[in-house]
Amino acid sequence: MRKIVIAVVVIAAAASFFLLKRDRPYDRSFETRVANPAYRDSGPVVLYDEGHRNAHTTSAGYKPLADMIRSDGYILRTTSQPFTAQQLGGVSVLVLVLAQGANPTNDSAAYSDSETSAIADWVRGGGSLLLVTDHWPFGLAARSLARRFDVDLSGGFAEDPKYHEPDRGESHLVFSEENGLLREHPITRGRSDAERVRRVLTFTGQSMTGPPGAVPFLLLSDSATDRPPGPARVEREGGNERVLMEYGDPQPAGGRAQGIAMEFGGGRVVVLGEAGMLRAQRDRTGLVGMNMPGYDNRQLALNIMHWLSRAL
């Protein structure tokens, strides 16, 4: 079993992984202006959660996405409050990205039982949810909420030795029309041929399954694997803290997914098993996310929002 060092910081224990991850630099040259906005006046209200130790916020890791959503005509608001039926009133799309539990190893739920009930009831009544998760520890923190929609999150680390970006390695997964892993759905079709999504790149993440009727628009191949998370622990020495986890041997992940879309009562749900696909990051490894040339991650993000807001 291999050991992963998640974080080393001089700060409060519960925030260690969060603080390291949220400050990822974004690509300031990324084009966030939308040439053909879905809404030209007062668009639907999008509520973005920033109250559950979220690793990507609208001012840091997901700022390019937030700016693009605004340019597309949506009214984007953020919240740091617990979710209630009253708070969700008037909201069209709820966006939950990389929430974390209070436990430093993140094997605790990010959302309380009352919050998951409020969110599920709101979606059933016609709301739309975008739930963005990732590999450990984010899969475990979101698992209880995902289960309310009959979505099973592995919480592990996905790889594909066959369908991946050659220059990046097996953890950079390629979904395309050509390899048959980018499945037909309004999200991949768009409103016109110009909006059609043909190639998507993800960056490790985890695998998932959905209920009958859910569409796995990012389908994992028969060669894909998922390394399950194992025991995690916190080591402290002086003011330093490390969160370590041992993960198991690769397990078959063929037929599972990294992107699922479904109807839930009167509402709609999209669950993503990887968060980097909707970032626009520039760091020492190069470009990551919507700014990757040769891939349609940018259009995928717009199409997801269009489908959730029923513009598509």
Task: Label each residue range with its predicted role.
Residues 1-11:
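N-terminal Sec-pathway targeting helices
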Residues 12-312:
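Short, surface-exposed patches at the edges or C-terminal ends of soluble domains, predominantly
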